[in-house]
């Protein structure tokens, strides 16, 4: 898992951060730990050793810039070299809203291409454009049905042939006509092996027909450094590959290897799949990615996620909080918002100091606790939600029984409510809660049992 890589790298860097004195011996020891962490994540050994030499050279020879301590300088060197390993710069998907764009998705069978087509449609939808999908994979029996279910979930038009009697080229040609009103057409092509010349020829025919704005190669993140050969083969067959989307990074022990391998052949990685949900697709930014796995956070992405799930009820709740009203009704709305943002592990990794060494159990406990808190509040009357101070012995007993929990858990919820209310009170008065203060207390109450 990538969180294992992050944990190992963070532990290595902590040796530098916690040291009273940094010498050559410590630098070499930390570099060995970094090498081990990267090789375990299936990063190419040659790449790892070349990077290690650079880290060692800079850490020993370079003087820290003004304003940075020796320890901070070494941590920055490691961070910069890890970013370089993954491609250094961010490559964005450029779409012109004034004209129709066509995206052709290619890749071998089992890479997660069909799911990625829906995720990409959702991503484009959130950017304010109208996407449409074409199911051009007639070789895999469940491909059309899978894309149909996903497209209905995100309310995106789909064209395909459920009978599978038409050729992919015929389906694509008809689909281009039917989806005239959309801004971006995403075509899910048949999964193919890099050696299947017939299918590659068909893909080239579809490329000539659609004149795509971008061809995106979908690669399975569980392949590790083998991803390099796959990307290279497709790039040689279809030289116009515009970018790469790496899937299944949330559950892969070889994710680091896949990313570094693809970056090595100078094929820009534009997207990464970080979960099974249609919203679990992210624009790939090497700097943000490394920041998160090292536990440094990614507040920009966290804010983007928050904006994506903001709805009218959430805005009303925030408006009430800013006016000084914070009851269990507002707390419930906040927990609903957090639940919509995605896996708790992913959210917490975006908060500085909360990623890297975060135990998996803590993230799971947080997610479970959120669900239990909502169940408890569902067992309360409106009067109790508006006036939590009314919840005394008899009411406590009734609510606990209705929610199927112990009375101590209701008390735990009320304690969490009180802490959160105080934090929002400070926010209203212009004091930003710090991770080490009240905000840290809020997160600890959610993450750990008392």
UniProtKB/Swiss-Prot annotation:
Signal peptide start and end residues: none
Alphabetically ordered keywords of this record: Cytoplasm, GTP-binding, Hydrolase, Nucleotide-binding, Ribonucleoprotein, RNA-binding, Signal recognition particle
Localization per record: Cytoplasm
A GO BP entry: SRP-dependent cotranslational protein targeting to membrane
PROSITE patterns: SRP54 (PS00300)
GO MF annotation, one: GTPase activity
Catalytic activity: GTP + H2O = GDP + phosphate + H(+)
UniProt subunit comment: Part of the signal recognition particle protein translocation system, which is composed of SRP and FtsY. Archaeal SRP consists of a 7S RNA molecule of 300 nucleotides and two protein subunits: SRP54 and SRP19.
Repressor is among the record's keywords: no
Name by which UniProt lists this protein: Signal recognition particle 54 kDa protein
Family under the similarity heading: Belongs to the GTP-binding SRP family. SRP54 subfamily.
Main location: cytoplasm
Written domain comment of the UniProt record: Composed of three domains: the N-terminal N domain, which is responsible for interactions with the ribosome, the central G domain, which binds GTP, and the C-terminal M domain, which binds the RNA and the signal sequence of the RNC.
EC numbers on record: 3.6.5.4
Chain's role: Involved in targeting and insertion of nascent membrane proteins into the cytoplasmic membrane. Binds to the hydrophobic signal sequence of the ribosome-nascent chain (RNC) as it emerges from the ribosomes. The SRP-RNC complex is then targeted to the cytoplasmic membrane where it interacts with the SRP receptor FtsY.
Gene Ontology CC: signal recognition particle
Keyword Nucleotide-binding: yes
InterPro entries registered for this protein in UniProt: AAA+_ATPase, P-loop_NTPase, Signal_recog_part_SRP54_M_sf, Signal_recog_particl_SRP54_hlx, Signal_recog_particle_SRP54_M, SRP/SRP_N, SRP54, SRP54_GTPase_dom
Residue positions binding GTP: 107-114, 188-192, 247-250
Pfam families recorded: SRP54, SRP54_N, SRP_SPB
């Amino acid at each position: 898992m990538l969180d294992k890589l992050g944990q190992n790298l963070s532990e290595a860097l902590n040796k530098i951060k916690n040291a009273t004195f940094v010498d050559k011996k410590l630098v070499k020891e930390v570099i060995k730990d970094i090498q081990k962490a990267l090789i375990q994540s299936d990063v190419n050994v040659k790449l790892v050793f070349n990077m290690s030499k650079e880290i060692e050279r800079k850490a020993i020879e370079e003087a820290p810039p003004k304003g940075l301590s020796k320890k901070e300088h070494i941590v920055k060197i490691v961070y910069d070299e890890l970013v370089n390993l993954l491609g250094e710069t961010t490559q964005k998907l450029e779409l012109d809203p004034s004209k129709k764009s066509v995206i052709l998705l290619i890749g071998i069978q089992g890479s997660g291409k069909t799911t990625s087509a829906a995720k990409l449609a959702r991503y484009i939808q959130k950017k304010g454009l109208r996407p449409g999908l074409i199911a051009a994979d007639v070789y895999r029996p469940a491909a059309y049905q899978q894309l149909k279910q996903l497209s209905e979930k995100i309310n995106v038009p789909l064209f395909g042939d459920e009978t599978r009697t038409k050729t992919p080229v015929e389906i694509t040609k008809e689909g281009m006509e039917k989806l005239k009103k959309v801004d971006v057409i995403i075509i899910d092509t048949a999964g193919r092996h890099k050696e299947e010349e017939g299918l590659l020829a068909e893909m080239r025919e579809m490329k000539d027909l659609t004149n795509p704005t971008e061809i995106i190669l979908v690669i399975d993140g569980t392949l590790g450094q083998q991803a390099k050969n796959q990307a290279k083969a497709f790039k040689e067959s279809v030289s116009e590959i515009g970018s790469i989307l790496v899937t299944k990074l949330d559950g892969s022990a070889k994710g680091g290897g896949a990313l570094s391998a693809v970056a090595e052949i100078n094929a820009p990685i534009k997207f990464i799949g970080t979960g099974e949900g249609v919203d679990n697709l992210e624009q790939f930014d090497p700097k943000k990615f490394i920041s998160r796995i090292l536990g440094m956070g990614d507040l920009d992405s966290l804010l983007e996620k928050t904006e994506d799930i903001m709805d009218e009820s959430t805005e009303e709740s925030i408006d009430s909080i800013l006016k000084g009203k914070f009851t269990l009704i507002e707390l419930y709305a906040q927990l609903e918002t957090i639940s919509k943002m995605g896996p708790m592990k992913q959210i917490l990794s975006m908060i500085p100091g909360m990623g890297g060494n975060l135990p998996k159990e803590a993230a799971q406990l947080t997610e479970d606790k959120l669900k239990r808190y909502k169940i408890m509040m569902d067992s309360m009357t409106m009067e109790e939600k508006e006036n939590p101070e009314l919840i005394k012995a008899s009411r406590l007993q009734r609510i606990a029984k209705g929610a199927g929990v112990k009375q101590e858990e209701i008390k735990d919820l009320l304690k969490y409510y009180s802490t959160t209310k105080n934090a929002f009170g400070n926010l209203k008065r212009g004091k930003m809660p710090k991770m080490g203060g009240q905000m840290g207390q809020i997160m600890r109450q959610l993450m750990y049992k008392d």
